[in-house]
Amino acid sequence: ASIIHPTSIVGPNDFKPGLPMQAFVDMANGKRKLMPNWGYNFIDVRDLCDAAISAVENGKTGQNYIIGGDYHMYLYIGELIGEKLGRKVVYGALPEFITYLPLPFEYIRALITNKPRVLTLDAIHTAQTGNKVVPSSLAREELGHNPRPIEETIYDTIEFFQKRGLVK
């Protein structure tokens, strides 16, 4: 068996949005007009599925594969969401120290609403210290991993959420 290690998984057909996807929904609905000045390496779930199938069919036994896309800033993701919706949804970057202030309130909100926290200390730490260059070259070479452009992922994702009524 081969082992795959995806980066931050995003994309359409997410019927119960997790942390990154809920952030996209919130941006689209105007709930997050300012975003932190950081990002993540995002991988489209459809590309991850293709890589997983290829790992079963072509992967080397015991080999680990990093399945990543490209690093993108949340500000850019907000621009893409705005393009898809035909309106501006993100207006600028938050100073880094301010990102810590809502943590206790986010925790309480999650307890009351029984919904996952969109912002966690771990998410802040990962975004601040995470490697912006994630090497997926082995997966590209041995599994034929070829992630689609983030623009396609975001447009398809927002369209999916619109159809589900999560994005107005």
PLM ranges: what are they?
Residues 33-41, 105-131:
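Low-complexity, charge- and small-residue-enriched intrinsically disordered regions
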